């Protein structure tokens, strides 16, 4: 696949990420979003799509990076798995919550 085969927004993300090769050069979400003139949510969505297409873009608490070693890749995967587990717990709680949970709370007006 060639860079030109990607949508323009994705091309811009990939090009920007070339400056962040290695976990020690990770870039914060808000900084990258500002550089690319995207909302943080839009950028997250595009990075998730790129990851799904086989682009190795890792994320840790310090931001996004291109892994250069298996250890860096593993750290990014662990972060993603923890995020997935957290989302799964939230979905489970939301799914099981009573629709009148707010009315059931004592002391709320």
How does the language model describe each region?
Residues 76-109:
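Long, low-complexity, charge-rich intrinsically disordered regions
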């Amino acid at each position: 696949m060639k860079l030109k085969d990607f949508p323009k927004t994705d091309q811009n993300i990939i090009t920007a990420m070339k400056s962040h090769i290695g976990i020690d050069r990770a870039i914060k979400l808000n900084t990258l979003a500002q550089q690319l003139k995207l909302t943080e949510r839009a950028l997250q969505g595009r990075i998730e799509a790129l990851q799904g297409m086989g682009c190795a873009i890792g994320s840790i608490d310090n931001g996004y990076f291109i892994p250069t070693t298996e250890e860096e890749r593993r750290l990014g995967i662990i972060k993603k798995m923890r995020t997935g587990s957290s989302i799964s717990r939230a979905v489970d709680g939301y799914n099981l919550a009573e629709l009148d949970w707010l009315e059931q709370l004592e002391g709320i007006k």
